[in-house]
Each structure stands twice: as structure tokens, then as C-alpha cells.
Amino acid sequence: MRAGHFGWRAARNAVRREVQVPRLDFAETRHLNSLVQRPPMAKSSGIIVTVGITGASGAGYAQSVLRLLDGDPRVQRVFLVASEAGMRLLATELGVVPTDAKKLPSLLTGTAAKKIEYLPNKDIGASIASGSAIVDGMVIVPCSAGALGSIAAGTAGDLLTRAADVCLKERRPLVLCLRETPLNRIHLENMLRVHDAGATVMPAMPAFYYAPKKIDDLIEQFAFRVLAQLGLPQEKQYRWKGGKE
């Protein structure tokens, strides 16, 4: 009985030596991911977008993005989800404290916001948690380092990170507006991981070459660029035409 047992182990080990699964390093993985084409998002009308808000500073960016999406005739529907820290951020930076969370879209946009639907972050069974739901893309603005890490690790512990994970697995546009500085090695590696998985890492870095007059100009121009990444270019976005030496 004992001899037969060792004979079986020897045979198993022999098979393992014959069948070896190659391990891919980061460079090889990036190359393979680059070969997988992501379906284009842009279409004439009826675009559905998910907007996520986390606790990183930059609530004004989220507000501007939502206002633009709400007013864009090409956008049919917007799903809004905010983490607990994201809700605290909105209260701290914008003074938005809804007594009813469903009123959050209208409080942020200053309109009826009929095309924006608020989804609780704890509702892991919401439509956007499934790849079968029709969603054309997602932006997390601002995106905290914590949310970035969760997405990079694929843990998806709440609706916000699950919706982002769905975009990656379905090869849909995912824009992460990271708001963190300085960056440590873990942040940089997580940025590389989500990039290689198909996301667009778009740190919240405003531009100054168009001579903005006020902070709102900086915020709005950045929001224009965010929407461009989602296939929704805006006519008012400043376009650099070259400078003089």
C-alpha cells in the first residue's frame, strides 16, 4: 500500500515536470494587453456613463463633470455612486449634505438632473455591478489612492470598485482621475497595473497654458478633457495651436 502510494506520487511529479505553465512578467503582460482592442465608446446618441466619487480632494471636478454630462444631449443616462468618504468630501468642499441621497444629483448640478440616477455604494446588486448592464464607460473623479489600489487588486468590495472592475473586464473605457501627491512606489505600481488592464490614468492636473482667469476655469477645462476621454469632446475645450518662440 505504501509502495503504491509513492509510485503514484512519482508519476504525478513526472507529469508536473513535463507540463510546465510559463509565467509572464510585467512587460509580457503589457504587450498582450496592448493587443486586445477596446471597443470604441463614441456613438451619435444614447451614451450611458457611470460617475464615481471617492474621498480624495477635488469635489469641484466631480461637480463639473456631472454638469457637463447632464447638459450633453448625447448622454442618455448617468449613474452616480459615491463612497462614504466621497459623501464626506462633498459636504466638506461643496457644502452638499443631502437629507435624501437621491437628491444628490440635483444638488450637485443645480438642475432637475433627470438623467442622473444616484446608486448607494453598498448596493452591490445594482445594475452597473453586472457586465450585462448597458454602460458605455465610467469615470472616477476624484479617484483616491485607496480606490486605485482596490481596482488594481481586483478586490471590488463595494459598488464603485465593482463597477470599475466590470468596465475593465468588459473592455469599456475607465478613466481614473487620481488625486494624490506625492506618489509612493505602491501608487505608481497600482497606476501601472490598472493601465495595463485597460484603464486611463488621468491625474487631476489642471493646465495653465491657456491663461485661466479663475479656479472654475481650471476645473472646467479639466472636465472637458475628461469627457473627451469618454468619447464626448466639448466645443468649449481649449485647443493648443502652437506658441511663439
Where on the chain are the PLM-derived regions?
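A cross-family phosphate/adenosyl-ligand binding-site feature
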Residues: 35, 41-174, 182-245
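N-terminal amphipathic/hydrophobic targeting modules at extreme N-termini
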Residues: 3, 18-24, 29-34
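Generic detector of bulky aromatic hydrophobic side chains
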Residues: 17, 25, 110-114
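Alpha-helical protein-protein interaction elements
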Residues: 16-18, 27, 53, 232
